C-alpha cells in the first residue's frame, strides 16, 4: 500500500444511530458492506517520541490481516473533517512494518529512531467495524460503523462512532454526503481520535 492523505469525518454514536446510519447507507444505490474485527495496539517510547512528532503508530489485526500504520497529524476542521498523512503496509510485526514504511513515504528518520528505541504498547482498541462502500456518481467513500472497547492502564471505556472516509472522485460530493448524513441523523462531531480517547482513560 502507499501513502495517502486520509480525509474523514467522525461522529459520536450509539447503537440506535449505528442502525440508522446503516439504513441510510443501504438505501443508496451502489452500497456494499462487510464486517471486520479489529484489534489495534498503539505504541510509543517512554519519553513519547511519536507523540512529540504528532504521530501515531499502531499494529492492527483486521480479520486475518496484520497491518502496521503510521499517521501524521495534519488538519482538523470545525465541521468534523480530519485530514492526515497515513502510511500502512501488511506486516507480521511492528518492527517488520517500521522497516517497510519508509519505502512507502513515511519519514525515514522517525522510523529509524522508533526501530532503535524501546517501543511499548501504550493502549489497545478492540472493535467490530461494519464497513459500507458508497458510490455517488464517480465519487466513492466508505462509511465505518465502529463499536467496541478502548483500554489503557487497566481501565476501559466503550467505543461507538461513525466515520465517513473519502476514497476517490469528487471531494465536493464527499463533503455533501457527509453533510447530508450528519443533518439527517443529527450527528455530533467526535473531535478526538481513538488513541487520544484511550490515553485519556
Residue ranges and their predicted role:
Residues 1-201:
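Phosphate-end processing signature that detects enzymes handling 5′-triphosphorylated RNA
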Amino acid at each position: 500500500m502507499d501513502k495517502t492523505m486520509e480525509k474523514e469525518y467522525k461522529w459520536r454514536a450509539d447503537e440506535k444511530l449505528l442502525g440508522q446510519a446503516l439504513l441510510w447507507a443501504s438505501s443508496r444505490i451502489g452500497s456494499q458492506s462487510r464486517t471486520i474485527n479489529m484489534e489495534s495496539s498503539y505504541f510509543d517510547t517512554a519519553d513519547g517520541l511519536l507523540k512529540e512528532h504528532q504521530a501515531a503508530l499502531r499494529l492492527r489485526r483486521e480479520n486475518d490481516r496484520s497491518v502496521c500504520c503510521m499517521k501524521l497529524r495534519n488538519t482538523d476542521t470545525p465541521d468534523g473533517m480530519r485530514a492526515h498523512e497515513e502510511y500502512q503496509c501488511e506486516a507480521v510485526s511492528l518492527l517488520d512494518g517500521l522497516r517497510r514504511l519508509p519505502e512507502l513515504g513515511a519519514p525515514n528518520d522517525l522510523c529509524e529512531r522508533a526501530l532503535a528505541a524501546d517501543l511499548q504498547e501504550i493502549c489497545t482498541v478492540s472493535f467490530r467495524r461494519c464497513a459500507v462502500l458508497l458510490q455517488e456518481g464517480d465519487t466513492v467513500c466508505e462509511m465505518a460503523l465502529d463499536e467496541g472497547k478502548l483500554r489503557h492502564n487497566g481501565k476501559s471505556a466503550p467505543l461507538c462512532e461513525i466515520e465517513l472516509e473519502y476514497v476517490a472522485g469528487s471531494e465536493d460530493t464527499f463533503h455533501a454526503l457527509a453533510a447530508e448524513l450528519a443533518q439527517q441523523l443529527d450527528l455530533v462531531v467526535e473531535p478526538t481520535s481513538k488513541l487520544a480517547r484511550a490515553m485519556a482513560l
